[in-house]
Amino acid sequence: MPAARETLLEAAHAAVRARPWSAVRMVEVAAAAGVSRQTLYNEFGGKEGLGAALVSRLVEDFLDGTGRAVTEACRGGADPAACCAAAAHWVLRTARAEPIVHAALTGCWGPRTPLPSRPPPPAVWARAAREAHPAEPGRLAHVLCDRAVAGLDRATRLPVGGPGPRPRGGPAELVETARGDLQRAYEAGLRIALSYVVAPQPGPDEEPCGRVDAVVRALLAR
């Protein structure tokens, strides 16, 4: 029942934004979604399964949003460094607004948030080196970078650093920059942004995003 599943996740999200996850009751989530409690259990198996599914959904939405932020900035005429700064702005804003995303990025889970599912065994991770898991902040940081670079690909309709003519309307730097250099520069920039998630400072996001821009710009100019 995909529709019921979506409605239940939305109801669970609304519930955890209103009170700690430890105080959220399954019967209340089912009632808010307009389904029976049995339907909820059929979909998720229990509160732990519902919470893990909600965490996965919000983290995936966050990662998708990172790519969209880069795509929109690029299509607006921003160069690669400014596009990374746009991704950093999305990261800071979302981590501040969504406690579950903040917990996934920092690894600091508590009673106010549901817990992610357990990560797969190391042998499975070895076959999926660039897949994200909410319980693994290090892997999440890698995938965050991948999604940002993929946002440039979508904006230009051409793999960054790939062959072929320069895309119309896209910055020339996107084609000329080798993917490996861009990947490393973006990872450095986004890890700076993540440091502000772990240890935030007062004031607007323009200052940390400006530092991201400066670092990425310097790395790409080497």
Regions found by a protein language model. Name each.
Residues S56-D64:
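Short, basic, alpha-helical segments at the C-terminal edge of helix-turn-helix-like DNA-binding modules
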Residues A53, T66-I100, P167:
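Hydrophobic alpha-helical connector segments
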Residues M1-H13, R17, G76, P119-P121, ...:
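Actinobacteria-biased recognition of intrinsically disordered, low-complexity terminal regions
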Residues R93-A97, A150-G162, E187-E206, A218-R222:
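Amphipathic C-terminal alpha-helical segment
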Residues L9, A85, H89, A141-D153, ...:
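An amphipathic alpha-helix signature
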Residues L63, A103, R112-E176, G180-E187:
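Amphipathic alpha-helical packing segments from all-alpha helical-bundle domains
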Residues A33-F44:
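Short hydrophobic/aromatic patch on the recognition helix
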Residues M1-A32, G49-A52, R57:
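Basic, helix-initiating cap at the start of DNA-binding domains
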